[in-house]
Curated annotation (Swiss-Prot):
The active site is at D168 (nucleophile). It catalyses: formyl-CoA + oxalate = oxalyl-CoA + formate. Homodimer. GO terms for molecular function: formyl-CoA transferase activity. The gene is frc. This is Formyl-CoA:oxalate CoA-transferase. The keyword Metal-binding does not apply. Involved in the catabolism of oxalate and in the adapatation to low pH via the induction of the oxalate-dependent acid tolerance response (ATR). Catalyzes the transfer of the CoA moiety from formyl-CoA to oxalate.
Length: 424
């Protein structure tokens, strides 16, 4: 079955996480992604957090499925010729270099347009134009500057970064959408364009409800926040709210049976107004359905600590899965805190392709996250990540149509890596 992006060729000049997240998603959808890597070392993540000796790390393999790898020294004159040929033959170039790197390599936007006016150049930067645009950004820096850290954690504690990679992977996902949009636009315009996503912007986009709350503060306290019920005044910025729900429906993480020894024996429980009476019945407080102190959402807001304390008394008598089984038939929204071990052992996730087992020639089998986006007519298969330079000759011959003598000249120039010494 043909894939959605069959026929789209992508020159992948990305490394670490943000860019590879983008290009891997496009590869899953069928694009031919050619990953350009530095001879000898390749993407730095090949050797980072290595768990199996002499094998690519999971950090690399889980972000570079379905790609081809070519090693290339772009500073070498022959290497620059190869790169120019790749630019001519590709539809998209994706890069997440520091600002100015492509220009210094001789591939400014103006020069790229001369080489291939239909090429889409997609870039990830830390910040957009402004006082910080030349600063280097990593995952946690993006979270801190994009509004996530200042609004995550508890009111009386430090700002916190989230375990989800919203800065790196979140930006990569935004860029993938931008690339597909630019490809569609090209069908009308016939021209390439630049697509740029800043990590700060991506994090802020995912924190839009906190910007919503920032503006609501001008009109009074945020009544769904715990501190309102505790009588604590609000400041002039959106506060950290612990595990309060961000959608206007009060919610908390509550202890379940076994919490004393199991760090994940918890459940997230939402006191949605539509099912309040069912909640009262489930926890054994039927009088709360008519008591004016509890019956209406507005009356409950100053009493959320008391209410969730009572619900927790009930959840502590059940496992998190028992709570789910009891609440789901009543449409009471709740969800267990699942550990990565529990998720990795969930067979239903393998059935849907959300988790996949991948075999690798040097590290053996490992579990990876598959494509979270399911297309009915373009199912994604997950193939292993490439070894360093595995497809170099294939790309030179089959994609760029270089002759054997041309490939030999390129190799002997050192553009593909260290030149083997002649036998004595």
């Amino acid at each position: 079955m043909a894939k959605a992006l069959n026929g789209v060729r992508i020159l992948d000049f990305t490394h670490v996480q943000s860019g590879p997240t983008c290009t891997q998603l496009l590869a899953w959808f069928g694009a031919d992604v050619i990953k350009v890597e530095r001879p000898g070392t390749g993407d730095i993540t090949r050797g980072q957090l290595q768990d199996v000796p002499n094998a690519d790390s999971l950090y690399f393999t889980m972000l570079n499925h379905n790609k081809r790898s070519i090693t290339l020294d772009a500073k070498n004159p022959k290497g620059k010729e190869v790169l120019t040929a790749l630019i001519k033959s590709c539809d998209v170039m994706v890069e997440n270099f520091a600002p100015g790197v492509l220009d210094r390599m001789g591939f400014s936007w103006e020069n790229i347009q001369k080489i291939n006016p239909k090429l889409i150049v997609a870039s990830i930067k830390g910040f957009g134009p402004g006082p910080f645009e030349d600063c280097k950004v990593y995952e946690n820096v993006a979270q801190c500057t994009g509004g996530s850290a200042s609004t995550t954690g508890f009111r009386d504690g430090l700002p916190l970064v989230t375990g989800a990679q919203i800065g790196d992977s979140g930006t990569g996902l935004h860029l993938a959408l931008g690339i597909v949009t630019a490809l569609f636009h090209r069908t009308h315009s016939g021209k390439g364009q630049r697509v740029t996503v800043a990590m700060q912007d991506s994090v802020l986009n995912l924190c839009r409800v906190k910007m919503r709350d920032q503006q609501r503060l001008a009109h009074g306290p945020l009544k769904e926040y715990s501190q309102f019920g505790e009588g604590i005044p609000f400041g002039d910025a959106t506060p950290r709210a612990g595990n309060d729900s961000g959608g206007g429906q009060p919610g908390r993480i509550l202890k379940c049976k076994g919490w004393e020894t199991d760090p994940n024996a918890y459940i997230y429980f939402i006191t949605q107004a539509a099912v309040w009476e069912k909640i009262c019945d489930v926890i054994g407080e039927p009088t709360w359905k008519t008591d004016p102190n509890y019956a209406k959402p507005g009356a409950r807001l100053p009493r959320l600590n008391e209410i969730f304390g009572r619900i927790e008394q009930w959840t502590m008598t059940k496992t998190k899965f028992e709570v789910m089984n009891i609440c789901n038939p009543f449409d009471i929204p709740c969800g267990p805190i699942l550990s990565m071990k529990e998720i990795a052992e969930d067979k239903s996730l393998y059935a849907t392709g959300t988790l996949v087992e991948v075999d690798h020639p040097t590290r053996g089998k490992y579990i990876s996250v598959g494509n979270p986006i399911k297309l009915s007519d373009s199912p994604a298969d997950v193939r292993r990540s490439p070894l360093l330079g595995e497809h170099t000759d294939e790309i030179l011959r089959d994609v760029l149509k270089f002759s054997e003598s041309q490939v030999s000249d390129i190799r002997s120039s050192g553009a593909l890596g260290e030149v083997p010494l002649a036998a004595e």
